[in-house]
């Protein structure tokens, strides 16, 4: 058989080596980040790529300063965690119900709403920044976390994804639950939502990543330094009056940890959710 042929074995080995090299290429910036976080600013500002591993200049002083009780870093870190948690939960809650409704219920204007969702998906966020800002000012939500969260409690991408996934749910369960006297909300939360775990797992990863990395909108809305999120706080370390590259790099190391932890928890749902949800129609 082909799988036992020498040509196939060589192909598998070559393909494995290729992906190993590609993985190392992707991991190289992470290695540089970890290495740079252990060096002082004087070493980081050297000309050229500095990959020297010198125990004499490398230390954990950057992390010691970062963990100092007087450091505002953990305030930024906590702000990002809270905003990311609330934004992700609200986005999944509303987007899943909207997507489920568009897939299951037959009502007038359903297709028009779905087309509008597709159109909004194609509009860059930057195009909507000015009207969103004017609306936020009118609601007196500037320099508040509500102003940061409110525009993102419904995601057109998540609505589309949940709708596509819900199209594959068995309708017999709906009829059986209705015959047993279950309410529509009860059907969704008790029966259909558990069946949509892969979709929720995939969206938790994507929405958490979007919320954690959200930079432009919080930068526009937030004014107080104590309310900054982590991306804004780290960017504030770079200024015309001085650049704290050592703090920036060590802070960036911890900034990637929550995303890695979330992916490790929900990775088993990620591929299956994207695969199934992306092909239903």
Curated annotation (Swiss-Prot):
Disulfide bridges in this chain: none
- Location, primary (coarse class): membrane
The UniProt entry, under Gene3D superfamilies, shows: MetI-like
Location(s) in or outside the cell = Cell membrane
Q: Which gene encodes it?
A: araQ
Function of this protein?
Answer: Part of the ABC transporter complex AraNPQ involved in the uptake of arabinooligosaccharides. Transports alpha-1,5-arabinooligosaccharides, at least up to four L-arabinosyl units. Responsible for the translocation of the substrate across the membrane.
This protein is called: Arabinooligosaccharides transport system permease protein AraQ
Query: Which GO biological process categories is it annotated with?
Result: transmembrane transport
Instruction: State the conditions that upregulate or repress this gene.
Output: Transcription is repressed by glucose and by the binding of AraR to the operon promoter. L-arabinose acts as an inducer by inhibiting the binding of AraR to the DNA, thus allowing expression of the gene.
Q: In which domain of life is the source organism classified?
A: Bacteria
Q: How does it assemble?
A: The complex is composed of two ATP-binding proteins (MsmX), two transmembrane proteins (AraP and AraQ) and a solute-binding protein (AraN).
Q: Does the entry feature the keyword NADP, yes or no?
A: no
| Cellular component terms per the entry's GO annotation | plasma membrane
Q: Does the keyword Glycoprotein apply?
A: no
Q: Where in the sequence is the signal peptide annotated?
A: none
Q: Organism, per UniProt?
A: Bacillus subtilis (strain 168)
Transmembrane feature ranges: 15-35, 81-101, 112-132, 142-162, 185-205, 247-267
Residue intervals of the ABC transmembrane type-1 domain = 77-266
Q: Which UniProt keywords apply?
A: Cell membrane, Membrane, Sugar transport, Transmembrane, Transmembrane helix, Transport
Q: Which InterPro entries match?
A: MetI-like, MetI-like_sf
Q: How is this protein situated with respect to the membrane?
A: Multi-pass membrane protein
Q: Which family does it belong to?
A: Belongs to the binding-protein-dependent transport system permease family. MalFG subfamily.
């Amino acid at each position: 058989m082909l799988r036992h042929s020498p040509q196939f074995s060589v192909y598998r080995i070559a393909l494995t080596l290729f992906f190993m090299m590609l993985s190392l290429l992707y991991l190289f910036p992470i290695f540089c980040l970890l290495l740079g976080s252990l060096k002082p600013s004087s070493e980081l500002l050297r000309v050229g790529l500095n990959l020297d591993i010198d125990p004499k200049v490398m230390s954990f002083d950057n992390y010691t300063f970062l963990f100092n009780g007087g450091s505002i870093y953990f305030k930024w870190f906590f702000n990002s965690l809270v905003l990311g948690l609330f934004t992700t939960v609200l986005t999944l809650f509303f987007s899943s119900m909207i997507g489920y409704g568009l897939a299951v219920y037959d009502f007038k204007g359903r297709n028009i709403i779905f087309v509008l969702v597709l159109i909004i998906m194609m509009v860059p966020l930057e195009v909507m920044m000015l009207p969103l800002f004017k609306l936020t000012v009118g609601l007196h939500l500037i320099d508040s976390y509500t102003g940061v969260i409110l525009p993102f409690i419904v995601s057109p991408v998540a609505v589309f994804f949940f709708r596509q996934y819900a199209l594959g749910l068995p309708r017999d369960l709906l009829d059986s639950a209705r015959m047993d006297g279950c309410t529509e909300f009860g059907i969704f939360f008790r029966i259909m939502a558990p069946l949509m775990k892969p979709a929720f797992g995939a969206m938790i990863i994507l929405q958490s990543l979007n919320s954690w990395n959200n930079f432009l909108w919080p930068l526009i809305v937030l004014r107080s330094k104590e309310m900054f999120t982590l991306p804004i706080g780290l960017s504030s370390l770079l200024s015309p009056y001085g650049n704290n590259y050592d703090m920036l790099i060590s802070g960036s190391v911890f900034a990637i940890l929550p995303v890695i932890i979330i992916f490790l928890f929900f990775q088993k749902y990620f591929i299956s959710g994207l695969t199934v949800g992306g092909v239903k129609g």
